[in-house]
Amino acid sequence: MTLSPYLQEVAKRRTFAIISHPDAGKTTITEKVLLFGQAIQTAGTVKGRGSSQHAKSDWMEMEKQRGISITTSVMQFPYHDCLVNLLDTPGHEDFSEDTYRTLTAVDCCLMVIDAAKGVEDRTRKLMEVTRLRDTPILTFMNKLDRDIRDPMELLDEVENELKIGCAPITWPIGCGKLFKGVYHLYKDETYLYQTGKGHTIQEVRIVKGLNNPDLDAAVGEDLAQQLRDELELVQGASNEFDEELFLAGEITPVFFGTALGNFGVDHMLDGLVAWAPAPMPRQTDTRTVEASEEKFTGFVFKIQANMDPKHRDRVAFMRVVSGKYEKGMKLRQVRIGKDVVISDALTFMAGDRSHVEEAYPGDILGLHNHGTIQIGDTFTQGEMMKFTGIPNFAPELFRRIRLKDPLKQKQLLKGLVQLSEEGAVQVFRPISNNDLIVGAVGVLQFDVVVARLKSEYNVEAIYESVNVATARWVESADAKKFEEFKRKNETQLALDGGDNLTYIAPTMVNLNLTQERYPDVQFRKTREH
């Protein structure tokens, strides 16, 4: 049976994100992936500060200065017969919920681990998020050109700490100065490493067969013997790769390599296009939408300001779930019940924009947004439904924000509300006074907000500490009890950027006591967009 042209396009798509701890090499891998997909001609190695060659995927002012990727960029490139969409997530102090929400827009993740360090804190957090949807995970053990931990230990650590089985696909031969290459367990081939070829794709010498004398000649008898001994252990002790278990999120295929040395990334990409799922179905509040449906649907998972410093614009990122986008199409924005004509959607190669003529499930579109689109918005061809599972998280850090120039209160509020719609930060306005409280998931978000208020809204703001430990969204089915709760707790209540009522607790003890005192009121840690 041959697939229709539409279904062929759907089957070609692979949409994934990279998750890692800061400095495990995510930006470098992103570049090398693009290099293998021929999307960039030479990879700009991630830079020392002040160098002119910025990595392709870091593009807001502050990112350029700090050498970190703050915002989620989207890059599409061809690989073999597939079209791959890579969503880049912020790496540092995991900037914000942006990262978590980006993971709701992908069908698969690549986990990058620094093989000298093993599983680190941020990786654990991000893995918990992927677990909510049983997202399939591929693993890349990076930095083999440095001295690394014992590979068996690394696999054990991933299995024990992240509760996912490991199925090694390739296995390293030596490491650091003695790194010679990797052996492919399923192809029975050894790929030999040459140093210093980071910017170009190198011709790799391949030795067929584990017992081939050429292998001993190429890597030395000691390392060849060590490889054979290790493989006996590995094959006895680790999982075999099984595609069904991979798709269920129960085992992860593991690849070894060095992104900086441009080695091993293509083995992982081969696995990604062979095994990762084509665009998956999604839940809405009324039914499940399949990618094979020809009517268009999509949801907004992120809003980003100023992708173009020359224009004060904001772009909403939409993941296409079903149907084909065509230029000039009329779509229903379900939340406000309005039909909008979308004629100038964008596709990205981080920061380079080009207008799209068409897009298919799995693709990410950029919609120009003048404040009318919010995170979580669903677009359809008329059907009234809403995609679920795009979360807002209660912030963990709070500061009061105030102006150096009190006359700019209006600009400050506008800036904060826009930044909160974008998911860069959350803003709370206490009911009983005129304070503005900013809530964030990571410390760096506070700096980002002040920098962006200054550069985009021309507002100079400073922070003060504030007596808030945590926040919860509150609601109740019992109107009478809710009124009483609101009356008695007025000093602890605030409205967030979307005017949702929030309880801001000075201490965790206070929160627990208040929850006990008002059993009819729900205190929520997350809120659906």
Curated annotation (Swiss-Prot):
GO terms for cellular component: cytosol. One of its GO terms (molecular function) is translation release factor activity, codon nonspecific. Its main location: cytoplasm. Residues 11-280 form the tr-type G domain. InterPro entries: EF-G-like_DII, EFG_III/V, G_TR_CS, P-loop_NTPase, PrfC, RF3_C, RF3_dom_3_sf, RF3_GTP-bd. GO terms for biological process: regulation of translational termination. Keywords: Cytoplasm, GTP-binding, Nucleotide-binding, Protein biosynthesis. This is Peptide chain release factor 3.
